[in-house]
Amino acid sequence: MKNKIMKTAIFALLLGSSIAFAASGKVTISSPADGAMVDSKEPVKVSYEADPGPDGDHLHLYADGKKVDVIHQLKGTAEVPPLAPGKHQICLAVNTKGHVPTGVESCVNVTSK
C-alpha cells in the first residue's frame, strides 16, 4: 500500500512540475499573421520575440513539423524556405541546452500561393 501511495505521489509531483515547466516562458510570432497568404516562390520571413523562461536556451523553427533552423537570438527575424502551394504551419519552440522542448511554443497557419 505504501508503495502505491509513493508511486502516486511521485507521479503527481512529476506531472505538476512538468506543467509548471511548460508554463514558464513565452514565444510570440508577430509576422506572418495567423491565416496569412505567403508567396510560394519566396522564403517566409518570421518575426518573433521570445522569453525562454528559466530552463530555455534557444529556439527551434519548424515548418510543418520539420526543423528548419536553430535560433539563439531571442528577438529578430528568421526565414523558412519557400513553401509549396497549400496550407502550412510555422512554429517556434523553446528548447533547453540539450535540445529538449520545454513546451513553450507559438504557431501560425499560412497559405502559400
Predicted regions, residues:
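Short, compositionally biased P/S/T/A/G/V-rich stretches that sit at domain boundaries
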Residues: 23-38
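Aromatic/hydrophobic beta-strand junction motif of beta-rich domains
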Residues: 44-52
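Short acidic/polar inter-strand loop motif in beta-rich domains
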Residues: 69, 96-103
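Short, flexible loop/turn segments at beta-strand junctions in immunoglobulin-like
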Residues: 80-85
